[in-house]
């Protein structure tokens, strides 16, 4: 399926411009794009709610914001098309036609693989079937392994694919795992972009930087996975897009205000009301990049009078376990 510059390309480049793509980057990108007819993108959906896809679509429709950052100029530079080979939600084809694409594209090489949703591994992966191959069910786990072989980059879009997230919360009966827990042999290809959902500018900006041939510096810290167990993992978050803990003097706009003790108050710090922004692993740039579109004022969670729920945190949604059994799960941390 082809998505022209008024679709995928415009969204992706808008993100790059908004995140600081300079003239040198644009000139380099022009050379890269002119040397190729398309950039293949495979978007695989596993156990999730399609929220990251919806986040992506919101950016595509954001015409006003594009003009605000003059991204239509960059759009003219990065012209032609990006070839979104497979996306089960957005494809015009369905059923067997969809599967023909899926079962042929993984044999090619050089594509960017975007993975949305956690990967169920229980019952040999049969809790999540993405289609059929040779008349047999094709699990998301097997599809992920197949596409990982020839992928140039593997982007875990959203907290479910990056850290298990909501899909792997609680007792995790379907034994959901994160992408990097399954693809251990392709560790250097993987880029985690957590968020529930992933921020569209972060996803788009990451793709732009990869196309420009830039090396993304990653965090080398470790953090607990969702479910509250003792498993430790490299978070693989690019520092450019995940620069600091949200609860900081330069990142949180509410930190300077009084501590609120009631919900529904404006311009108050919600640290005592359960805000997860102060957690050492709530590292994200969502407030500086902002959420939403112009008609909803692009305020994001904090600007809308809410608190941070820590959706980019590897422990999200913060399940508490007693003797290995999930006893509660709360996105808030009341003091």
Stretches with model-predicted labels:
Residues 122-137, 165-171:
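Glycine/threonine-rich flexible loop motifs
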């Amino acid at each position: 399926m082809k998505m022209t510059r008024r679709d995928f390309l415009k969204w992706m480049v808008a993100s790059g411009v908004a995140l600081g793509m300079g003239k040198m980057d644009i000139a380099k990108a022009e050379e890269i794009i002119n040397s190729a007819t398309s950039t293949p993108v495979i978007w695989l959906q596993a156990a999730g709610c399609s929220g990251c896809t919806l986040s992506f679509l919101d950016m595509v429709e954001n015409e006003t914001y594009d003009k605000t950052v003059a991204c239509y100029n960059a759009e003219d530079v990065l012209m032609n098309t990006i070839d979104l080979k497979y996306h089960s939600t957005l494809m015009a084809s369905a059923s067997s036609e969809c599967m023909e694409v899926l079962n042929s594209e993984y044999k090619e090489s050089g594509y960017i693989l975007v993975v949305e949703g956690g990967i169920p591994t229980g019952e040999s992966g049969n809790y999540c079937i993405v289609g059929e191959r040779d008349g047999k069910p094709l699990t998301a786990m097997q599809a992920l392994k197949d596409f990982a072989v020839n992928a140039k980059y593997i982007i875990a879009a959203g907290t479910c694919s990056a850290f298990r997230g909501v899909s792997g919360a609680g007792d995790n009966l379907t034994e959901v795992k994160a992408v990097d827990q399954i693809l251990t042999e392709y560790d250097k290809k993987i880029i985690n972009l957590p968020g529930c959902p992933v921020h569209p500018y972060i996803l788009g900006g990451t793709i732009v930087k990869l196309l420009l041939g830039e090396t993304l510096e990653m965090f080398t810290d470790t953090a607990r996975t969702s479910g509250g167990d003792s498993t430790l993992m490299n978070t693989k978050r690019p520092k450019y897009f995940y620069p600091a803990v949200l609860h900081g003097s330069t990142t949180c706009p509410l930190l300077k205000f009084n501590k609120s003790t009631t919900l529904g108050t404006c311009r108050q710090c919600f640290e005592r009301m359960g805000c997860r922004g102060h957690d050492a692993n709530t590292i994200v740039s969502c407030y500086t990049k902002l959420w939403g579109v112009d008609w909803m004022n692009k305020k994001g969670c904090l600007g809308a009078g809410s608190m941070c729920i820590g959706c980019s945190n590897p422990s999200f949604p913060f399940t508490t376990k007693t003797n290995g059994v999930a006893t509660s799960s709360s996105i808030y941390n009341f003091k």
